[in-house]
């Protein structure tokens, strides 16, 4: 990072990293500047977490300084919600703590779940969203989901696989399933507020 701002807040160290457009970024397997910036932030977070000996929560990479406050708020909300996920890696991304943040009352988490998880799932269409919702509501049973939706179990597998590929969250994984379940609930609540 070409710019760095460090601040101490209570027993927390806040670090905001900045990058100029002319900074050399090494090639990576990920495409796009955001993926590369996220890799650099992850590397820095690993070093900071290791040297400080405490928990590290990484806010999302944002396009500019005008959005840095949002990233910082996400990271601070993640730090407050971190005790809710005992198995969280260190460092952990604030967006990976969205369910805990939402339960802790973080309104920004609700917006982010709608944008990052629910919107892509909803855009896939009702068969995919209802398959995920039914699968999670029935405790992860492929057969019960297939019976409930009047489709073959392979159709359920296919739909869940497509959701995993397109949305990035796998309903068959307990942690990802929690994220998807929260996204479906938040999406339903958003629709009911609009009605």
Describe the residue ranges of each PLM region:
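Cytosolic nucleotide-utilizing catalytic cores of signal-transduction proteins
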Residues: 1-195
């Amino acid at each position: 990072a070409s710019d760095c701002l460090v601040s101490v807040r209570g027993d927390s160290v806040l670090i905001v990293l900045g990058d100029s457009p002319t900074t050399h970024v090494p090639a990576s397997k990920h495409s796009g500047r955001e993926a590369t910036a996220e890799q650099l932030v992850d590397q820095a977070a690993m070093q900071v977490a290791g040297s400080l000996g405490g928990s590290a929560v990484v806010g999302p990479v944002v396009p500019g300084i005008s959005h840095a406050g949002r990233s910082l708020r996400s990271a601070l909300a993640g730090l407050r919600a971190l005790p809710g996920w005992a198995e969280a890696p260190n460092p952990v991304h604030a967006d990976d703590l969205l369910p805990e943040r939402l339960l802790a009352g973080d309104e920004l988490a609700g917006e982010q779940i709608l944008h990052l998880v629910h919107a892509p799932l909803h855009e896939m269409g009702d068969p995919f969203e209802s398959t995920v919702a039914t699968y999670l509501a029935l405790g992860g049973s492929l057969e019960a989901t297939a019976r409930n939706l009047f489709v073959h179990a392979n159709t359920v597998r296919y739909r869940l696989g497509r959701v995993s590929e397109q949305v990035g969250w796998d309903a068959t994984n307990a942690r990802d399933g929690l994220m998807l379940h929260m996204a479906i609930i938040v999406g339903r609540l958003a629709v009911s507020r609009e009605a």
